[in-house]
Design a protein with these regions (language model features):
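Central mid-sequence intracellular linker of multi-pass
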Residues: 1-53, 237-255
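Helix-to-loop junctions at the C-terminal end of transmembrane segments
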Residues: 113-126, 211-212
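Small-residue (Gly/Pro/Ala) motifs that create kinks and tight helix-helix packing interfaces
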Residues: 7, 11, 85, 117, ...
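C-terminal transmembrane helical hairpin of 12-TM major facilitator-type secondary transporters
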Residues: 125-175
Length: 259
């Protein structure tokens, strides 16, 4: 809570709207970054139809990604976040203190996973298959939790599941950047995020309802695993649809000829 508010204040006054206004960059850095962004925006625009703000609000690809974000990231993230303490209470005889420490392990795994996937994606300049691997990690491990008995094995599944879901988040956002630029990108990303964040309500609610109906949280994890897998298929489709249409290398070559 408090760190987020403090960083929000810093961001408000420190981060600028565009690179050319960033006083903390050198003149050379500002010029390079401005040209780089203009070149990439031109490449995206040349490979896709022009999106206005209003069109971005209702475009099928934007709405489709909103549902994918709901299924892959938000429903799973919030569904796990909300219920981990109750899950551990049901599966073990741990004290409240022990539940607090053990319940933090999935998020520690998620922290490590986000760093590793981000580093690898950046190093190899590839995001589609990194996202696919993260989706499979999450969906398979959450479904596997249905078929194990011990608390230890279930927690291993939960840790791998959380690692996969959290790793999906930054990789997912490379998809809309493939066909949205400028103000349309800001609008489209806001729409995707708004639809996806409905998972903050539906994820925990669905897990709770399934637990009440079956008496076991493992069925709730099964639901989350299936949801992540379906959303992953949607992301795979969108990546295949747009990835490769944008030729950044050609755009940079064309831009260099103008220098």
């Amino acid at each position: 809570g408090i760190p987020t508010v403090l960083f929000g204040i810093v961001t408000l006054y420190y981060l600028t709207d565009k690179p050319s206004d960033a006083t903390w960059l050198t003149n050379e850095e500002r010029e390079w970054l401005t040209n780089e962004m203009a070149t990439e925006a031109a490449a995206i625009k040349g490979a896709n139809e022009d999106y206005s703000i209003m069109k971005a609000l209702t475009h099928p690809s934007v709405l489709f990604l909103g549902v994918a974000y709901f299924l892959v990231v938000c429903e799973g993230t919030y569904g796990i976040n909300m219920w981990i303490p109750q899950m551990l209470k049901q599966w073990s005889n741990m004290s409240t203190t022990e539940i607090g420490f053990i319940g933090a392990l999935p998020f520690l795994c998620a922290l490590i996973s986000v760093y590793i996937f981000g580093w690898s994606s950046q190093k190899h300049q590839e995001s589609k298959w990194h996202l696919n691997v993260a989706v499979l990690m999450a969906s398979i491990s959450l479904v596997a939790a249905m078929f194990v008995e011990s608390t230890f094995a279930t927690m291993v599944c939960l840790c791998i599941g959380a690692a996969g879901i959290f790793a999906c988040t930054p990789l997912f956002w490379t998809i809309p950047a493939q066909f949205l630029t400028g103000t349309a990108a800001a609008t489209g990303i806001a729409v995707i995020n708004s639809i996806g964040n409905l998972g903050g309500f539906f994820g925990p609610t669905a897990v709770g309802m399934v637990k009440d109906a079956t008496g076991d949280f493992r069925y709730g994890l099964l639901l989350l695993g299936v949801s992540v897998f379906i959303g992953g298929i949607m992301c795979f489709y969108m990546n295949n649809r747009y990835q490769g249409k944008v030729n950044f290398e050609k755009a940079h070559e064309d831009a260099s000829k103008l220098d």
